[in-house]
């Protein structure tokens, strides 16, 4: 299951060169593009299966297999929004994490950076207004670097203070679903749906006017 995604995770950071300009690496680049596209297609299939279980949420497009600089970007993501949500609202998303030998998909409450408005960060900070539930964790951005923070009441208070002081720019709430070789797609979708329901209160809190 999701074999192309797993294989493509090992290509993180690899530079893609158009095959016609790649000289002796032409075939290698053709294979790289084919793998990237196949991995993205698997992510699209998964995202669509998940969308069918999350009505009224609608999926956005899955991220590209390479960025504008043509660097491979295998940690695909896909955002989900309710019909009433604006583009600058806080949304729900799934995102790949890990390496080929140990990986999974996280569900998160976050927003699209390039679509944010003056109010988006303040909305995102409201995820800290609710107590953190077991099995969830925070992902905090400090000085441009994001790092995992264990989901405890003590850390919630610490992050609230850090946000107030301007030391932490944004805090996501996340839930990890490890992917195993023996798992089937239906089981994975079920676990991701469960993650969505665990995180939904934080999404609702963030978008409350």
Name each model feature, range by range:
Residues 78-80, 105-109, 138-139, 171-175, ...:
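Generic structural hydrophobic/aromatic packing signal, biased to beta-strands
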Residues 60, 82-97, 136-142, 168-173:
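Short, surface-exposed, charge-dense and proline/glycine-enriched linear segments
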Residues 31, 60, 85-89, 118, ...:
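Acidic-enriched, low-complexity/disordered segments with a strong bias for Aspartate over Glutamate
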Residues 110-169:
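Short, internal acidic amphipathic alpha-helical interface segments
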Residues 62-64, 80, 157-159:
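Residue-level detector of functional hotspots within protein domains
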Residues 68-131:
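Aromatic- and glycine-enriched beta-alpha-beta binding-site module
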Residues 1-54, 149-209:
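Long, solvent-exposed, polar/charged low-complexity segments
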């Amino acid at each position: 299951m999701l074999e192309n995604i797993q294989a493509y995770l090992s290509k993180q950071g690899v530079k893609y060169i158009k095959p016609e300009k790649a000289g002796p690496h032409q075939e290698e680049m053709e294979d790289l593009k084919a793998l990237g596209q196949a991995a993205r297609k698997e992510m699209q299939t998964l995202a669509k299966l998940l969308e069918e279980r999350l009505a009224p949420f609608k999926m956005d497009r899955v991220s590209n297999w390479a960025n504008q600089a043509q660097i491979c970007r295998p940690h695909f993501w896909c955002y989900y929004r309710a019909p009433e949500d604006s583009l600058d609202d806080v949304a729900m998303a799934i995102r790949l994490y890990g390496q080929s030998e140990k990986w999974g998909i996280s569900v998160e409450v976050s927003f699209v950076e390039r679509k944010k408005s003056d109010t988006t960060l303040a909305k995102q900070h409201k995820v800290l207004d609710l107590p953190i539930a077991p099995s969830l964790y925070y992902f905090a951005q400090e000085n441009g670097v994001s790092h995992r923070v264990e989901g405890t009441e003590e850390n919630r208070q610490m992050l609230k203070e850090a946000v107030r002081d301007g030391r932490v720019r944004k805090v996501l709430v996340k839930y990890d679903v490890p992917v195993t070789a023996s798992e089937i797609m239906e089981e994975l979708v079920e676990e991701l749906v469960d993650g969505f329901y665990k995180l939904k209160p934080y999404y609702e809190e963030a978008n409350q006017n």
